[in-house]
């Protein structure tokens, strides 16, 4: 008796589509050597990064991540592969998976036939998803989906840390205004440590494209790159490693105009799109425990006898008839029955520990079964075999790969001021002989007149005022202390000596009358048109250093009221450069300086 197992052809499965949210990563576990039967794991990590605030021009973000998975079983051979069973341990999973493709069954571990686990050696230990595919044609794939139950660290985080800062921190409504965007991105160590990788990838290639978008608010009349670049434009292209940020700077020019009255609002002006990968690793910790499958083969039973003593002999032979597959013979059985299919006593042979590989056109024959029977018996044979785990001739699971699976973007927003917007710029310039010119430029960039403005400054240790007569209202002498337009000086300067900030002995504050709107915000102290129009007020004095003085300590200045270019708390601290048109807010917020200046504010209010 000869039994031959053959395969049937099948059509190619159509492309499977997955919905991608705001951030999409794709994690693919795939055999790069393309095993004949290949099992891959694809995970889409969908993260939403939302800028919720931009106080002091520094973005604050909320992160939300959801992970979906796809198991892909593909036949890369040129022949059918059949009776495919896949045991999967899905990390961070509630134990559920579902078939996307037709012709796929999802079972529990207890539903797997004992013949596969006992005789075939199919390992289901730890599996929470059992996949059964009766037949898979050449080039055909089947898909199974699963949902990852994220830990709080994964769900409330994202693969990347984004830092974004604007200078100026806010823009006024009405008119064309330009702001600089400082954009930094790095790998999120905390998030990656919570995944199956256990830490950050060693390196990630990353490209970021910036898109300006007026659709966030109909009051945007124009949005463009200040350098005339086309929109969108590439702003980052590089590699992230364990200890590295990728950083870029670009300028945006926009016109936000409306007749609506408002104090301030946070307005979206575009997105930053990410493209990245590949990354080695695995997010959820999902792994393939075992795969059982068979291909084309033939099985034959050989029978001889009887001899003079009614002795019969039989065995079973399996032959590998596949063209490119290798099998492992796991067990064989030979037994005999009468014509009514009743097993003959003593007529059975079993071997459940064969474990012999047979390649193409190779065969394996069991030991002989010998028994006595005075009639003509039926001899039966059964063989359990399975596809070998091999990258070239069997089934395989390759390395974990993380690749970009779609759009990854961050919404960017900036504060627009609907009333006044006050900015102070401090210039420190050498005048020779350890004397330095200190110039404070106070401007109102907004669309409405400001209230009274208080300007604060501190003099570092080992410095003293020089070449001044304390007649701040008389700039004509051009000595060491004056206000360019003395009619704008409403009070002060008042001296503060109770300063708790280390490195400073003396402080001053000036009370400036309401400043007219629509200054250009360039920080220039020689814009005499704006000075004459009361849009800009310039304060000047000189200091001289002695002994071991530290000029860097002079780069500090404060301003009040609330709607300033700095944080919406009082007082405000700003770091500046010596260039007229450039002003930089403190990246670290100078927390200790804020504590020290509390005494300054208290003094001014008591006065």
UniProtKB/Swiss-Prot annotation:
To M.jannaschii MJ1393 and MJ1394. It is found in: Cell membrane. It comes from Archaeoglobus fulgidus (strain ATCC 49558 / DSM 4304 / JCM 9628 / NBRC 100126 / VC-16). Keywords: Cell membrane, Membrane, Transmembrane, Transmembrane helix. The keyword Transmembrane helix applies. The chain crosses the membrane at residues 16-36, 583-603. It is a multi-pass membrane protein. One of its GO terms (cellular component) is plasma membrane. This is Uncharacterized protein AF_2028. It comes from the Archaea.
